[in-house]
Amino acid sequence: EEQVNVPFLPDERAVKCIGWQETCNGQLPCCDGCVMCECNIMGQNCRCNHPKMTSECGSRR
């Protein structure tokens, strides 16, 4: 399977990226709609593990 770099890929087949971002940094656009996401250092490969339910990225409550 050929892997392509995409800004957002909420899929189990998404490549596990380097540089685990458990919460949004505010500097990674791939984490805009996620509370938990995986992104590489460049922010090229990202996967949303848990979509945010609030308007603030990083809010856990």
UniProtKB/Swiss-Prot annotation:
Residues 1-13, 60-61 form a propeptide. The keyword Disulfide bond applies. Disulfide bonds join 17-31, 24-37, 30-48, 34-57, 39-46. InterPro entries: Agouti_dom_sf, Spidertoxin. It holds the Pfam family Toxin_9. Expressed by the venom gland. Keywords: Disulfide bond, Knottin, Neurotoxin, Secreted, Toxin. It is found in: Secreted. GO terms for cellular component: extracellular region. One of its GO terms (molecular function) is signaling receptor binding. Potent toxin that may paralyze and/or kill insect pests such as H.virescens (lepidoptera), S.exigua (beet armyworm) and M.sexta (tobacco hornworm). The presence of a 'disulfide through disulfide knot' structurally defines this protein as a knottin. Belongs to the neurotoxin 02 (plectoxin) family. 02 (plectoxin) subfamily. This is U1-plectoxin-Pt1b. It comes from Plectreurys tristis (Spider).
